[in-house]
């Protein structure tokens, strides 16, 4: 996909496309480093856009992994289908990310190991934001590794993600614009799924 087409989609759908340009290599590497690719994983990506993070995930992931790409923009979804048409591990889903549990079931999948997202949560209405977080949480496998990974201009989502007991965040300056890379873990290290106070006290 050309930079011109990506720019055009940003202008047409600024509430759905997080940035005016694709992510930098530094940001892509920081996000990919949050995954454990040592075994087959089920991964869902929200808003892959032109696929810059997607390509790095595919390059690193175990050969028996599966990747579900949720892209609401029809033109970007068509681009992804064309680009990844020869890889049977990848499914492109042109629907709202809140349909994650339903789509997992329709693909014969019980849980995800990871959900990764670059969609701009800060522009979402609060009710929709919290519903999506609930759907993500219920779709993640019940273990201490499973996580929701985001890269965002702001870190305001931490205030809404009270379902996740453990949170780790870092700031990437080597991107335009700079981004927070934040990981929300399904369970605390002691195996509990909710710490009861919602303050995400696992930051490091």
Can you say where each PLM-predicted feature lies in the sequence?
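Conserved SAM-binding motif I beta-strand of class I
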Residues: 66-71
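Glycine-rich SAM-binding Motif I of class I
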Residues: 51-55
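Conserved class I S-adenosyl-L-methionine
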Residues: 40-49
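Conserved beta-strand signature within the Rossmann-like core of class I S-adenosyl-L-methionine
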Residues: 142-151
